[in-house]
Amino acid sequence: MAPIQSHQSDRSPVATRPLLEVRNISCNYELERAVFDLSLTVNRGEQVCLLGPSGCGKTTVLRAIAGFHPVLTGGIFINDQQVSAVDVMVPPEARRVGMVFQDHALFPHLSVQKNIASGLHQVSARDRKEAVADMLERMGLTRHAKRYPHELSGGQQQRVALARALAPRPLLLLMDEPFSNLDQELRERMGQEVSDMLKENDITCVMVTHDQNDAFALGDKVGVMEDGAIVQWDTPYNLYHRPQNHFVADFIGSGVFLEGALYSVNGVTTALGDLSSETALDWIVGSQVEVLIRPDDVIYDPQGPVKAQVIRRAFKGAEIMYTLRTSSQITLLALFPSHANFEIGDEVSVRLEVDHLVAFPKESIPE
C-alpha cells in the first residue's frame, strides 16, 4: 500500500522547520482563564499528545489550534503562517487542518463514502471520487462504503472519521480524545494502528487525551497539563521514569511515595532500606524527601529483606498487580509475573530495586 501523498513529504530545508508553533497563548473558557502562557512546537512528521485530567485546558488548546477558539495573548503559527492572535483569526477551513472529534461527528444520514467525501471541497467530481476510493482502501472500509454510521462498529466509525479528516490531505491532524468511546482492547489496537499509519505516512498530529496509555501509544512527545499549563514536555519514557514534579509522578503510572532522608548526594535512606541514584540529587544531605516507588521497582524475592502481606490483587493476564502492606503499615504496589500467584492474606518477601530514583522535597508534597 503506497503512502498517502501528504503536503509535508518534501524534506527540503523549509520542510525541516516546525510545522506548528504555539507561542505564549492564553485562553478563556466560559469567562474563566483556562490556558496560561502556553507554548509548544511540533516538527513536521511528529506525533505529539497533550495529556491531563478533565478541566486542565487541553481541549481548549486543541480548539484554539483548529480555529474554533480565540486566544487572548500570544499567537499560533501553522506552516509559518500566523493563524491566531489577539487580532488574527483565520477560519478553520483555511488552516488546512483535519479534525477527529471525540464522538467521531459522523453524519448519520450519509453513507461511509459520502461522509468521507464531505471533507472534500473545491475539487472536481473525478478527484473527489478517486480520493474517497483511496481512503476507503487504506482504511479497510471498501466493503462498508454504502453502509451508514449506525451499521458500523466503534472501530469502523473511528476509521471513517480518520479517513474524512485525512482525505483533503491536511498539513496537520488534530484528534480530540479519539479512542475514549472504544472498549479497552479495541482502543489499544486502534491506537497502535493509527500510530503506525501516521508514522508510515509522515503525518503531523496533535492529540489530546486523559488516558496515558493512548498518549504513550501515539506520542513521540507528550505534554502533561495541569491547570492550564504544560508542566512537563517530554518523551513517554522520561515522563514515567524522570517526572519533573509530584503532579507528573502521581498522574503518570502507578506508585506510592516512601518517606526518606538523604544520607549522601545520591543516596536516600528509607524504612525499607537504602536507595541510590545514578546522578546527584538536588538537595543537601539530611533533607527529608519522598521517593517514588513504582510497581516494577518492587521485586519478588523469597530471600528479600522486606516482608509484607497481600491485601489486594488484580489479575492482568501475564502479570498480577498486588497491593502489599508491611508490619509498619507501609503500603506498596507490586507487579509480579502471574505464575507468582499469591492470595489475599499471604505473606511475601520483596526487595526494592529502583533503577531511576525519583525524589521530591517532603514539604513540596501536597496533602
Where do the PLM segments sit?
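Non-catalytic connector elements of ABC transporters
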Residues: 2-8, 255, 265-367
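A short, flexible loop at the N-terminus of ABC-type nucleotide-binding domains that lies
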Residues: 12-22, 27-37, 86-90
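Short beta-strand immediately N-terminal to the Walker A/P-loop
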Residues: 48-49, 99
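The feature captures the beta-strand-to-loop junction immediately N-terminal to the Walker
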Residues: 51-53
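Helix-to-loop junction immediately C-terminal to a conserved catalytic motif
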Residues: 66
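Conserved coupling/switch loops of ABC nucleotide-binding domains, chiefly the family-specific signature
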Residues: 72-75, 227
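ABC ATPase NBD Q-loop/coupling interface
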Residues: 75-95
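ABC ATPase nucleotide-binding domains
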Residues: 96-98, 102, 106-247
